[in-house]
């Protein structure tokens, strides 16, 4: 066959294939796949056997049912390849119905369809059962599809009594969530058997009808068909409880209300949600397989009793995939993550990131919904790496006598987690330091070992130390881990020589000797030792502290001699011990010195005579009423003190004549009068006191005795107690003089204050506050309210320049702005008021002076104010020149009389009287 004949055949075959493909596409576009019904209902027995066929669902597919797969959301039921629904196990159904969803899935396109299956439990009597078990419910042909009829419970009357027959058990109504409608979608139809006789109106009440959420369900009042008006959401509300009512057209109740239970059938519309998006856990390195790490949890809002809410877990990825890509596994049901492989090593991988997936539908990845979370697993450190020294030997150097000095740093390496007990190093000297001169402390930052001198070393004894140090961790090593040979190192420490100070071997040195040894007496040799035996240095001595300057030291050999007499009773002696400090210095470079203390215990000798106590006393002038107790004080110590001997001297003879001493004990005696009466006064009584030293010392002391008259109780009745108290006559006189001076000063101050007060009152009476124009605003009388005198001659105000001089006329109308040209009247000089406080006399005197003043206007005289007119000599005010007060002459104020004396004094410079 040629090529020309084959080509037309190929084109013809291709054309036919294209035509067949177009026809197949046309058929598919005209075909609509899906279940024959949106819901199936069947009656079943309460007891269902395993494998029992319950009903059959029909599915129409445009490509045939060969590639279809059926599933249910219930583990109790399965669907065969032909659509037959059967039980997977023996069931005892306690409720009135069972509802579940059947899903048809196309394997190639993964497209799926769902239908609701309701299995009603047959619990009614045979008289009311119109269906056979195992068959799909046959509906009334007059009813629309899915018009499930729920008859009202019937009643029967007998003999006038109304008996209710056994009611229908109204099965729950199941509504799948997320239905696409169309809405309203019919659920069931309810009817009463009385609707054949009378018209009946139906209604429903309850949550979802007339209670929020409102109008989720409604009912056709005439036909009784109940509808759902919108898609349901089981996660929002899983069930509804309604009540159905039947009334006639007048609203009268025809039937008792019945309960309707509506259950929302769950659909797989919610993904599992993890409680946390990131989980943190930890596991020890080196853990064995099966070690628990952490638990992740995801919740699904769908029904947990169905596959929609059954969540399963799995690990999606692990990062890093070292040493194995599957180091962990997860329990699919509980979410527990455990190790599945060995080899966890923190020093290699410190952290793993694991992506965990949660899938519902029991983990079916084809049908279930999934979600993911992150699990961060930290590998925690264990002490599986012993610390190791970076080198096997270390060296250091330290001067002798130096402490708390770091002489060497020991470095270690530890691969465990820094700054943890598994990393922190602990150092221990295991040999080479029997005397404990060194310790090794750990630097908390670098983890180094610091070899520190804690006890001074001596170059003359040890010139070097060879230490062996071992290092470990604060935490013990993990099981099976052994210490490394590199955990031990040697440390060589060299000691360098320094110039050490001389020291006194016996420091403090104590010697005992009697006080009073003469100057120049050798006491002891206080020598020092130079520890630098190999330097052959000379030591010189000197005094550092000698408070009383009693001692001398030989600068070469340290011999100490006395430079003065040692006195135990001196203020420089404390508790019989005199203390001095000496200095020993070598001639090294640089020089070094040491100090030593010498303590001299002074043994007491009887070198102090006793002193009589008290120095003053008083006694009654007649004997027998009282006596004076006397004793003695001695600066020495026992046995150079008491018992004391008290006696009166023979000279003067009056002492033994007037006084007598009675011994009480070794320390006390009584001094009393020997005669019957001794005149009052102060007497000096000498008394000889002798101690018990060897040899004994005596002292004659004088006691001042105040002899005074006494009352029946033996107490002095004079002021002698003052003197006895320590106040002499001079002191008393001085106190009295001070008191008198103080009283005089107070009196003078009171007199001065009285005089000042009188002067202030006098000034106030002589000066009217309104007349004092200094620094005050002048107040002039106001002429308001009209003129009192209305009968004066107005012609006096006309042409005042033509009038005769007012001074030549008798007192009447006069000018008050001119100084009178006549002779000034002579006023009587006011006598000095002997008592300025007498206000009445002062006022009367002023009144008489005013009455005798010829220039004083009468009370009812007419005051004529100037009318300047054209002939005024004042001119313009602007012609006035300002001038200082120094340019003015105020002497004329002295001519105005005593009434203006204060003003004249103010402006004329006069002094106030």
Curated annotation (Swiss-Prot):
Tissue distribution: Distributed widely in mouse tissues with high levels present in brain, skeletal muscle and thymus.
Protein's membrane topology: Single-pass type I membrane protein
CDD domains: Cadherin_repeat
Ranges in coiled-coil conformation: none
Keyword Cell membrane tagged: yes
Subcellular location field: Cell membrane
Glycosites: 146, 280, 409, 554, 629, 658, 699
Signal peptide range: 1-20
Main subcellular location of this protein, as a coarse class: membrane
A GO CC term attached to the entry: plasma membrane
Residue stretch(es) of the prosequence: 21-166
Organism taxonomic ancestry: Eukaryota, Metazoa, Chordata, Craniata, Vertebrata
Transmembrane annotation, as ranges: 732-753
Domain Cadherin: 167-274, 275-389, 390-504, 505-610, 611-721
Protein name in UniProt: Cadherin-4
